[in-house]
A protein has these predicted regions:
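SAM/dcSAM-binding transferase cores
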Residues: 1-20, 217-266
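N-terminal accessory segments
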Residues: 1-56, 60
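Glycine-rich, charged/polar anion/phosphate-binding loops
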Residues: 4-7, 17, 125-127, 206-210
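The AdoMet/dcAdoMet-binding core of the Class I SAM-like
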Residues: 14, 39-179, 186-195
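Short, well-ordered coil/turn elements that cap or connect secondary structure elements
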Residues: 113-115, 172, 199-202, 239-241
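Flexible loop/turn segments at secondary-structure boundaries
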Residues: 148, 185-186, 214-216, 231
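Conserved S-adenosyl-L-methionine
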Residues: 180, 202-213
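A SAM-dependent methyltransferase catalytic signature shared across enzymes that methylate proteins
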Residues: 194-207, 226-230
Length: 266
């Protein structure tokens, strides 16, 4: 996929990664980390709505959520739409990502960082989760992909059994953890591998998918829990005040249907 660039808004390096923001003709503003697409303002809402609302609407009386990564603020924007949440913790290792996104992509967070329920911690999420004393009803893992041909990647240890075991320890009995699982067409193994890893730490595992054109079309998501499940019906009454742009009864039913371009059971 190629796009025309109107302006290169940001090119800077943090201690952790290269950060670039482009204004493009076809996909609006786009965020790249270490040269990899993270989002475009043309379709980011599809990704963020799926990652937040599909699991959160499945939970009974959720009160506390944790966001791992998500420095662009899109996950926070969707979480703060839920008045039933009393607290939203966020741990992000790279504060420069947050700063550049708040400056050049303010529509992503839409003021969510200033919500009084949000507590932001700048720290390595691996250590944060291992030492956490809180119990969370929802844990959203919005971390960068791991690429086989790149060594020492920032988020690599956030895809390990040790990390998932630690997440299980801070998850409420009726809670859920959810993560992005890459592109179903070009990286179908990613969803399969994450679900297999989840299954070593959680008794219940599943997946759903959404259409995100800037990610190559079909994006996978994996979830795990100690008992909670994703309902087969659209929770319309709970969703009616969430100002959703992508999710509705039709796209929800598609999301929870068998994922395309993957083997049966994925």
């Amino acid at each position: 996929m190629s796009v025309g660039v109107r302006e290169h808004l940001v090119s800077t390096a943090s201690p952790y990664q290269q950060i670039d923001v482009y204004d493009t003709f076809e996909l609006g503003k786009m965020l790249f980390l270490d040269g990899h697409v993270q989002l475009s303002t043309r379709d980011e809402y599809a990704y963020h709505e799926c990652l937040v609302h599909i699991p959160l609407l499945a939970l009974r009386d959720p009160k506390i959520a944790l966001v791992v990564g998500g420095g662009d603020g899109g996950i926070l924007r969707e979480l703060v739409k839920h008045p039933e949440l009393d607290r939203i913790d966020m741990v992000e290792i790279d504060d420069l990502v947050i700063g550049e996104c708040r400056r050049h992509l303010p529509e992503l967070s839409d003021g969510a960082f200033d919500d009084p329920r949000v507590k932001l911690t700048i720290e390595d999420a691996f250590g944060f989760v291992k030492n956490a004393n809180s119990v969370y009803d929802l844990v959203v893992l919005d971390v960068t992909d791991v690429y086989e041909d790149e060594e020492g990647e920032l988020s690599e240890k956030l895809f390990t059994k040790e990390f998932y075991d630690d997440v299980a320890k801070i998850l409420s009995p009726n809670g859920m953890v959810v993560t992005q699982a890459d592109n179903l067409v070009f990286c179908p193994y990613s969803l399969q591998d994450i679900k297999a890893s989840f299954a070593e730490s959680f008794p219940k595992v599943g997946s759903f998918w959404g259409l995100v054109p800037s990610f190559g079309g079909f994006s996978g998501f994996a979830w795990a829990s100690l008992g909670a499940d994703i309902p087969q019906f659209w929770p319309g009454s709970r969703a009616q005040d969430l100002r959703l742009r992508y999710l509705n009864e039709l796209t929800y039913r598609l999301a929870i249907s068998p994922a395309p371009f993957t083997s049966p059971g994925s």
